[in-house]
A protein has these predicted regions:
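Disulfide-stabilized, aromatic/cysteine-rich ligand-recognition loop
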Residues: 1-55, 59-66, 74-133, 143-168, ...
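Active-site-flanking structural segment that lines cofactor/substrate pockets
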Residues: 70
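Short, conserved phosphate-binding/catalytic loop or strand-edge motifs used
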Residues: 137-144, 324
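Functional-site microenvironments in short loops/helix caps that host divalent-cation chemistry
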Residues: 149, 153, 163-212, 217, ...
Length: 444
């Protein structure tokens, strides 16, 4: 397993760029991808779609490498021809609503992709080691494209881990040193905390010294009313009560889109749950394990919303401004200092979720505000005031500001670098599974 006891796992500071630090950060990023993909037993499995709305895994193996070349070319940092076919083939991911994207064929030989990746790695290292590397990189710098590509690869480390988790268990093996956080003696109860009203400002500060994606910039001032929030995220044990009470058979708990989805997929439990001989198991990354009842339940947004309706008493999911209020009162700096990460299951500290509240720092505050699993929010994905597209990646956020994409915050155990920042704003279709869960909230 990648050594998580060093700072090369954490997002680089853009105002004090040093080639050795940037090189370590890039290599750590690259090695995370290599480690994850080493879990695939046979090359043939790279050409299987673990999720029919995604490309086969071979695409993502090549995509993160091609992205470096394509963005560096746009920025003017690389102008040679490496492999035009691969640069085009691996350029853009799949749009689940586009049939032509889903039916793309003609994927290259695995070994050819390995060679391509090796060449890309050499190119990136040569750019990092060049005397022209600046000491400071900002939004307007051509080298922003390099940071963009590194953080993009870290995003795909996490999203690819979700795809691999959907492979048949016989197709994968757990890499050496990959650790699950199993602790069955920690059984928190559902507890609510009162949060007083307050003002918040959403958005990454313009003078931030970390890389940020375009949708993180801009700002929005909000007044947040007082509310009560569950101290911990909802656990597998708590979600079992919803299942046992007929939650998946009761239409009133579901939105129309959610009900249609679970019926079309014949769902009766969360994606990674397994029931065999009247006993529940959980599909972890590479194993089927006894159900860890104290882990946060991992669900799609539709399931989280249905649970809230089942609970009654006007229970709902957090809005982004409410989540921001919680983090403002927990954190006083942008990127937690290195020692503070000991309080959260993030930056690949473990290769799985952990018992909710296991790393609780302050008994008066909600737990797992960063890491463990993503926090599913109520918001549709939307731009902040003053949002502007970055010219190096014009379609990163803009096409997804709509009611079809819901937001998440806080990161997961698999979130690293920029993704582990409290300013990171994630979005997904509400029927897409991620390492994501939720907590309950009600307005007072």
């Amino acid at each position: 397993m990648i050594n998580t006891e060093n700072q090369s796992n954490f997002s680089i500071k853009t105002n004090i760029i040093a080639s050795d630090n940037l090189e370590a950060y890039f290599l750590n990023t690259w090695e995370l991808t290599e480690l994850l993909f080493s879990s695939i037993k046979d090359v043939e499995s790279y050409y299987i779609n673990p999720d029919p709305r995604r490309h086969p895994l071979i695409f993502y193996f090549g995509h993160v490498a091609a992205f470096y070349i394509n963005k560096l070319k746009i920025a003017g940092l690389y102008s040679e021809t490496l492999n035009t076919h691969f640069e085009n083939l691996f350029a853009v991911g799949v749009d689940p609503s586009t049939k032509d994207d889903l039916e793309k064929h003609g994927w290259p030989n695995y070994q050819e992709v390995v060679v391509f990746r090796t060449e890309v790695k050499k190119i990136i290292l040569s750019i990092i080691q060049s005397d022209s590397l600046p000491k400071c990189i900002d939004w307007d710098s051509p080298y922003w494209s390099l940071l963009m590509a590194i953080e993009h690869e870290r995003i795909h480390f996490e999203t690819s881990s979700v795809l691999i988790r959907q492979y048949d268990i016989e197709m994968v093996k757990k890499p050496d040193g990959w650790m699950y956080k199993l602790d069955y003696d920690f059984n928190p109860e559902l507890e609510f905390i009162k949060v007083e009203s307050g003002n918040v400002q959403l958005g990454r500060p313009s003078n931030s010294n970390m890389y940020g994606w375009d949708n993180e910039y801009g700002s929005l001032n909000c007044f947040v009313k007082s509310f009560e929030v569950s101290k911990n995220m909802i656990t597998n044990a708590e979600f079992l009560d919803f299942i046992s009470s007929g939650g998946y058979e009761t239409k009133d708990y579901w939105s129309e889109a959610g009900w249609n989805w679970i019926k079309s997929q014949n769902l009766s439990m969360p994606k990674f749950w397994i029931i065999r001989d009247q006993k529940y198991y959980l599909r972890a990354m590479f194993d089927e394990i006894d159900m860890p009842w104290n882990w946060p339940v991992e669900v799609i947004a539709y399931e989280a919303e249905a649970f809230c309706r089942w609970k009654g008493n006007n229970m709902r999911l957090l809005y982004e401004a409410e989540w921001k209020l919680l983090t403002d009162r927990y954190f006083n700096n942008e990127l937690l200092d290195f020692d503070s990460y000991s309080n959260f299951n993030t930056n690949f500290r473990f290769g799985s979720p952990s018992p909710v509240g296991y790393f609780a720092l302050n008994s008066d505050l909600p737990t797992d505000l960063l890491g463990n699993v993503w926090e599913i929010l109520s918001n549709d994905f939307y731009p902040l005031d003053g949002f502007k597209v970055h010219p190096y990646y014009k379609d990163f956020s803009l096409p997804f500001f709509d009611s079809g994409h819901g937001m998440m915050a806080g990161g997961s155990w698999a979130s690293t670098g920029n993704s582990a920042s409290r300013y990171y704003r994630l979005w997904f279709r509400r029927d897409f599974i991620q390492h994501a869960g939720f907590r309950l909230i009600k307005t007072i």
